[in-house]
C-alpha cells in the first residue's frame, strides 16, 4: 500500500512558500509530522495514518500552507482516538503560522505600525505610536523575553479561535503569532513599565490567567477600548432621551462592548403624552429600535455580534408584552428576538407570588421613583401607590409568575436578578440605587443618566494551581490574583472610553471584575466529584483567596494612589466586607482581621473586584471548561471546513486510556448515551462520579455552591440553571431556592436538553388537525387541550410553592 502511495505522490508537486515547485514525498510529510510528536503518547498517535489521509486529499499544485492546514484538520479529526491528536493538530497549525509570520516581536510591531491599507493605499497604523516607540526602545529585551514554544501549548480549537478573531491581520493576512498578541496585550496595559509587562506576558503565556476578549482585541491599538461591560440607564423618558440612549448603545457596541440597559423609567403603553396630546406606544416599539441597532452595529467591526440585555422591573405595566418579545411565534411587530431580556425583581414580588397575593402593574410616569429605591423604601412607596389607586391594573402575582416561567421554558430568557440582594450586598450602595446588571448578569454597578457603568474583566485558570501531588496552591493563586487586580486597575486609566459618561463613572468608582475558568478541570485533577464535600470546600476557599488577594492588592494600590473617589460611606470603608453582608464566616485560610486593619488605614483603590463571567471564548482558547460550570457533556461535535467530528472530554479519555477501557466500542457507548457515562457499568463508580455532567448534578447543589462562593463575590456571577426536562414546578422551586439562598443572580440562562428523539408531526387530512407525537406524549392542537395543559402547568407551579423543599428535592 505504501508503495502505491509513493507512486501517487511522485506525480504530485507542491508550491513552496517561496514559489518553487517540489515533488510531494510521502516520507517528507511523515517526517515533518513526526518531528511535532515530541512528548506525545506514540502508542496512540500514528503520523503515517495522517500522512495517508493527507495524500488522499492532495491535488497537483497544492501549496505547502494548504498541505499543513489539511494535515492539521485530519489530526484534529482523530482527537476522539486520543487527546494528543488535538495537540498535534495545533502544533502543525502553529508551525504553519510560524512559517508565515516574522519571528521578532519588534519587527512584527513595526509592520503593524507601518500598515498600508491596500484598497486606499493609505497608511493606517494598527498599533499606536506611543506603544510603537515603547517597543522600539525596548526591542532587545522584549524580543528575548518571548518564548515561542509556548504557542505549541494551545489545542487545535483554541488556536483556531485565536486565528479567527484575535490575532491582528494586515490586509486579511494574519501578522501576529499568539505570543506576539500576548506581549502586545502586556505592553498595551503597562506601557513603559517593562518589568510589569514581562511579568504579565509570562503569566498570560503560561496560561495562569487571561484578559477578556476586548482587551485581547484592542490592547496597544489606536483606540484601546479594553472594557467588556457597559451598564446604562435611559437618559430620559422622552424622544430625545430615548434616541440619546440609542446613540450611546451604538457607540458602545461599535467599540466591542456588551450592554445592559434598564428601561424601568419608560412610560407604559396607553399613558398620555402631554407635549403631543397623544398616548405612548410603550416599550415594545422602542425595543424593536434597539433590536435593529444591535443587529446593525456589531462589536468591533464583525468580531462579535452586537449584544444588548434589557432590564425591567416586574411592576411595569408592559411586563407581559416584554415577556413575549423573544418568543418564536407571534406577530413580528411584537417581537425583538435579537435582544436579551432580564427581570430586576424586588423581594416584594417574590413574597406576593409565594403568598398567592395580588400584584399591581404600574406606569413609571404615574407612579414615579419606584426604580430609584429598594428594600423597605421600595415596599412603602409601592404599597402607597396601590392604596392611592394609581395602578394601571391588578393581576394575581402567580399569573405573572406563570408567564415568566412560560417564557423561560420557551426561550431561556428572561434572566432573573434579585434587585434587593444586588443593592443590599453592594459596596456601591452609598452611591445610589443599582438599577440593572450587564449582558451576562455578573456585573452589578451603579448607573445613572449621567454615568454609564463600565467593567474591565479577566479570568484566572483554576486548573493551573493544582500541584502534581493533587493539592491546591492557594498561595500562588493569591499572587496571580494580585497581579490581575493591578492590571485591571491600570486598564481603567489607559482605556479608551467611547463616551464621556463611561469615563466619568469608571474613574469615580474604579470597579474591576475578576472571574475564573477551569473549575471543573481543577476538580477532576484533584479527583473531587462536583457534589462532594471536598469540592464544596475547595469552591469556597478558592473564592476566599481571590477576594482576599484582590482586596489586598487594591489596598496596596490605595497606599500609593489613594482610595477611589466615592470610597467614603461605602460598606468597605466601615469595615464591612462581602461575607459580612451574607452573615458568613470564612475558613481560617487567610487573616481577615489583618486585612481589615490595613483597609481601615489606607482604604481600597477599587469599589468592586470579583465577578465570575461566562468565559465562553477565552476558555476555548485556553482549553478549559467555562467558568465554574460543570461539564455539560463528555463528548461533543466540532465543525471544521473538512466536516464534523466527535471530541471527547480529554480528562476522561486519558483516564479511560490508563484503565485500558478506551476503544471504538466505548466511544460509541458514550455517543449513544449523549455524552453521559453513568450507565456504562464497565467504568469504575469513582470515575463515573468524577465525570457527572451538569444534567446529572442536582440543581440544589449548584445553587448551594453559588451561595457559598457568593459570600466572597462583591459583584455577582453568571449562574446558569441546567434542567434536562423543565416543568413549571421544578423551575418555581429552583427560583425560590436561589432567592432564599441570597443569590444576586438567580438565573442567567435556563439551559435545557433537546428531546432524545425528534418530535414527529402528523396531519389528519380529514379534519385538518395537527398533532405532535413525541417523548412527552401527545398534545393535540385543540383549545381544550391547550387549557388542560396550562392548568396542569399551573398546578405544578402552585404545588412547588406549597411544598417548597420537598419539591426541590424530588424535582431537581
Swiss-Prot record:
Residues marked Important for electron transfer (site): 748-749
For molecular function, the Gene Ontology terms on record are: ATP binding; ribonucleoside-diphosphate reductase activity, thioredoxin disulfide as acceptor
**GO-annotated cellular components:** ribonucleoside-diphosphate reductase complex
Q: What is its EC number?
A: 1.17.4.1
Key words, A-Z = Allosteric enzyme, ATP-binding, Deoxyribonucleotide synthesis, Disulfide bond, Nucleotide-binding, Oxidoreductase, Phosphoprotein
Q: Binding residues for ATP, per the UniProt record?
A: 16-17, 22-28, 64, 68
- The record places the site described as Interacts with thioredoxin/glutaredoxin at 807, 810
Please list the residues that bind dTTP.
237-239, 254, 267, 274-275
- Which residues are modified to Phosphoserine? 782
What Pfam families does the database record attribute to this sequence?
ATP-cone (PF03477), Ribonuc_red_lgC (PF02867), Ribonuc_red_lgN (PF00317)
For the biological process aspect of GO, one term held by this record is: deoxyribonucleotide biosynthetic process
Residues binding GDP: 213, 228, 438, 442, 615-618
Sequence ranges assigned to domain ATP-cone in this UniProt record: 12-103
Residues bearing Phosphotyrosine?
786
Q: Which residues are annotated as site, described as Important for hydrogen atom transfer?
A: 229, 455
Q: Which residues carry this modification: Phosphothreonine?
A: 778
- Please tell me whether the keyword Cytoplasm is annotated for this protein: no
- Which catalytic residues are annotated? 438, 440, 442
Task: Sum up the protein's function in the record's words.
Answer: Provides the precursors necessary for DNA synthesis. Catalyzes the biosynthesis of deoxyribonucleotides from the corresponding ribonucleotides.
User: Partners and quaternary state?
Assistant: Heterodimer of a large and a small subunit.
The name this protein goes by in its record: Ribonucleoside-diphosphate reductase large subunit
